């Protein structure tokens, strides 16, 4: 894929981990296909995940009543964000594809990655209320989550004790990535890695590399288009009445989050529509 650039964000502390092996496999596979690959190994970088006044290098607008969202937006516009944030934003700006490699921790992303999102995805850079979801700043970019779990796949099924993996993925894939415009590709889910034998691990790595050969051509996951909603505060950003009427008699809702009180479409956050 000549001319394409990928950013791999790794959130695991150990170089001997399977997450690190997945990151290495991804980098090798993409480079083999002609991609330029940049990495953010958050633990190796000792990335600071805590938002604070220190993220702004210039003069604060209201130091007596510090409000991070407002101050960080102003700092972004004026070029006064801390250098570590700016460096990550530049990586994002240059990337066509972003891969997030991490172990599922407490049904979400590791704290260091959550902090990366909070500090790097600054308002006006990553989102605005005038331009969000499929109109967001990153709408020309694609993203994929590559996740390992401790539990088995059955534990994250409809009948499993942990509940439906689609529901777990929604806040990350819709609430963070698609909110900023990303076209989100099917997640790479590696279940129960701690109980997976060596030969099976090799097969997983090879399958991951094979997938990455043509990942740019994959169909993204489905999210309800922003055109289905009245995008203003007066209307409450609610789904348009005519859309609600049209969907009323359908068996399934539109997505995990927009289920409209009906059954959730099967694997809405795991498989793309065919």
From Swiss-Prot:
Gene responsible for this protein: NQO1
Protein source organism: Homo sapiens
Name recorded for this polypeptide: NAD(P)H dehydrogenase [quinone] 1
Description of what induces expression: By dioxin. By oxidative stress.
Positions with a binding annotation for FAD: 12, 18-19, 67, 104-107, 148-151, 156, 201
Record-level GO BP terms: cell redox homeostasis; cellular response to oxidative stress; innate immune response; negative regulation of ferroptosis; negative regulation of protein catabolic process; nitric oxide biosynthetic process; protein catabolic process; protein polyubiquitination
Lineage of producing organism: Eukaryota, Metazoa, Chordata, Craniata, Vertebrata
Superkingdom to which the source organism belongs: Eukaryota
Effect of residue 204 to V: Has no effect on the affinity toward NADH
Catalytic activity: a quinone + NADH + H(+) = a quinol + NAD(+); a quinone + NADPH + H(+) = a quinol + NADP(+); ubiquinone-10 + NADH + H(+) = ubiquinol-10 + NAD(+); menadione + NADH + H(+) = menadiol + NAD(+)
Residue numbers carrying Phosphoserine: 82
Family recorded in the similarity comment: Belongs to the NAD(P)H dehydrogenase (quinone) family.
Entry cofactors: FAD
E.C. designation(s): 1.6.5.2
Gene Ontology terms for molecular function: cytochrome-b5 reductase activity, acting on NAD(P)H; identical protein binding; NAD(P)H dehydrogenase (quinone) activity; NADH:ubiquinone reductase (non-electrogenic) activity; NADPH dehydrogenase (quinone) activity; RNA binding
